[in-house]
Amino acid sequence: MSRFETQFATLNAKNEGAFVPFVTLCDPTFDRSFEIICTLVDNGADALELGFPFSDPLLDGPVIQAANNRALTAGHSSEDSFKLLEKVRSKYPEIPISLLLCANLIFAKGLDAFYQRCAEVGVDAVLVADIPLLAKEDYVQAAKKHGIQPVFICPPNADEKTIQGVAENSEGYTYLVSRAGVTSAENQAHAANLDTLVEQLKAHNAPPILQGFGIAQPEQVKEALSLGTAGAISGSATVKIIERNLDNHEQCLAELAEFVQTMKAATK
């Protein structure tokens, strides 16, 4: 069983959902980022979704764009992100790790080389945010060759064919987007049809569904679980804590610890 499958089985046995924070690797620096990720895991994160710094992200709202810029301004490359992943994996051999990134980052390294490097540093799954199902073939092939689970996004406007494609091609987990638009902790609206989407994904035997976009409060974690999802992903709200504490790293870690504990408590 993969780390994601093992974790979901463990959570199911305890009747808990998953809380999965997202941060950008190397934001604001390599060393601080490592401490931030350790704080997330040590305070109850069930898995990690991590981004590579990139100058032109499509789905990212202003908070995560700023995180990308901080890491890039600090001079961090994709290889630094891989080294950071390696460090995280050696400290936490069991935690499921997924990458959420844009296709250009993968192209820059070459498909095969990118997924090979992911495997070397202990990444479990990769979600390429801007690759539609129609163009998935090469990515899925390269991922599977290196034992990496491909993950796909189910948008709120998905038709039956898309839902089936997402369900059949995703491994590890399925990413259900709460609403159209870019990531944001402020925009906490979600599409009205999410419960139907969850039902349809399950009917096609999709892997466990994690809901993301606009998850900033414990109530939203509970709401996501009540729809039948396996958990919730919180990116902008997590990264905002980093952003507002750039001058006080200890305060940043303390606030992140409290945030993760509160969000995790909502899954029980």
UniProtKB/Swiss-Prot annotation:
<comment type="subunit">
    <text>Tetramer of two alpha and two beta chains.</text>
</comment>
<dbReference type="InterPro" id="IPR018204">
    <property type="entry name" value="Trp_synthase_alpha_AS"/>
</dbReference>
<comment type="similarity">
    <text>Belongs to the TrpA family.</text>
</comment>
<dbReference type="InterPro" id="IPR011060">
    <property type="entry name" value="RibuloseP-bd_barrel"/>
</dbReference>
<dbReference type="GO" id="GO:0004834">
    <property type="term" value="F:tryptophan synthase activity"/>
</dbReference>
<feature type="active site" description="Proton acceptor">
    <location>
        <position position="60"/>
    </location>
</feature>
<feature type="active site" description="Proton acceptor">
    <location>
        <position position="49"/>
    </location>
</feature>
<dbReference type="InterPro" id="IPR013785">
    <property type="entry name" value="Aldolase_TIM"/>
</dbReference>
<comment type="function">
    <text>The alpha subunit is responsible for the aldol cleavage of indoleglycerol phosphate to indole and glyceraldehyde 3-phosphate.</text>
</comment>
<keyword id="KW-0456">Lyase</keyword>
<comment type="pathway">
    <text>Amino-acid biosynthesis; L-tryptophan biosynthesis; L-tryptophan from chorismate: step 5/5.</text>
</comment>
<dbReference type="Pfam" id="PF00290">
    <property type="entry name" value="Trp_syntA"/>
</dbReference>
<dbReference type="InterPro" id="IPR002028">
    <property type="entry name" value="Trp_synthase_suA"/>
</dbReference>
<keyword id="KW-0028">Amino-acid biosynthesis</keyword>
<dbReference type="GO" id="GO:0005829">
    <property type="term" value="C:cytosol"/>
</dbReference>
<keyword id="KW-0057">Aromatic amino acid biosynthesis</keyword>
<keyword id="KW-0822">Tryptophan biosynthesis</keyword>
<protein>
    <recommendedName>
        <fullName>Tryptophan synthase alpha chain</fullName>
        <ecNumber>4.2.1.20</ecNumber>
    </recommendedName>
</protein>
